[in-house]
């Protein structure tokens, strides 16, 4: 039994060591400063492409920010010398929950009219990678929200810091 546990431990450590670093976790410090932290996970598919998803949520009071929740899956194509780094273009979708309007009455607290939308967009930016696999990104873009809504478009911008593992 001891030998089996030792073999399993050695095998799993060798397999874990040999796997390439194709995963990234990032935080958008710009959105965080604005009261809506955005966390992202990205999976590298090849030297020049990756897929990922960003999740933003509001921690601010409803009176100061319209965004309540946003989920943004994306695909990126890279044009740099390093693996999944350098200049990139991005195609994204967004599922968004936001405050459409606020109603006030004299005898009660405000009433928030919440809406949910779906949109498609594009962005461009640059990813910088250190030898220690620390990541810095800057990007910007815009998307169109479809359906009967009041916002019409959503921004896609950020300054992110993260780690590749």
Segments from the language model and where they lie:
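Bacterial Sec-dependent N-terminal signal peptides
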Residues: 1-21, 165
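Transmembrane beta-strand segments of Gram-negative outer membrane beta-barrel proteins
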Residues: 19-29, 87-93
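A generic beta-sheet turn/junction motif
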Residues: 20, 31-33, 82, 163-165
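Exposed loop/turn and edge beta-strand positions of beta-sandwich/beta-sheet ligand-binding modules
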Residues: 21-23, 35, 69, 118-120, ...
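Solvent-exposed loop/turn segments connecting transmembrane beta-strands
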Residues: 26-38, 58-67, 83, 145-154
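Gram-negative (and chloroplast) outer-membrane scaffold detector with strong preference
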Residues: 42-138, 144
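Outer-membrane beta-barrel "beta-signal"
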Residues: 77, 153-165
């Amino acid at each position: 039994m001891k030998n089996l546990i030792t073999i399993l431990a050695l095998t799993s450590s060798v397999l874990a060591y040999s796997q390439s670093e194709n995963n990234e976790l990032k935080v958008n410090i710009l959105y965080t400063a604005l009261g809506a932290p955005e966390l992202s996970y990205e999976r590298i598919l090849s030297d020049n492409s990756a897929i990922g998803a960003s999740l933003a949520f509001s921690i601010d009071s409803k009176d100061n920010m319209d965004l309540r929740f946003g989920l943004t899956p994306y695909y990126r194509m890279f044009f740099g010398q390093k693996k999944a780094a350098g200049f990139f273009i991005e195609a994204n979708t967004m599922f968004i929950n936001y405050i459409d309007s606020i109603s006030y009455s004299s005898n009660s607290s405000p009433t928030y009219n919440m809406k949910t939308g779906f949109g498609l967009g594009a962005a461009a930016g640059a990813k910088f990678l250190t030898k220690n696999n620390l990541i810095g990104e800057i990007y910007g873009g815009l998307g169109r929200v479809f359906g009967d809504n009041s916002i019409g478009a959503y921004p896609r911008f950020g300054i992110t810091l993260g780690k590749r593992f």
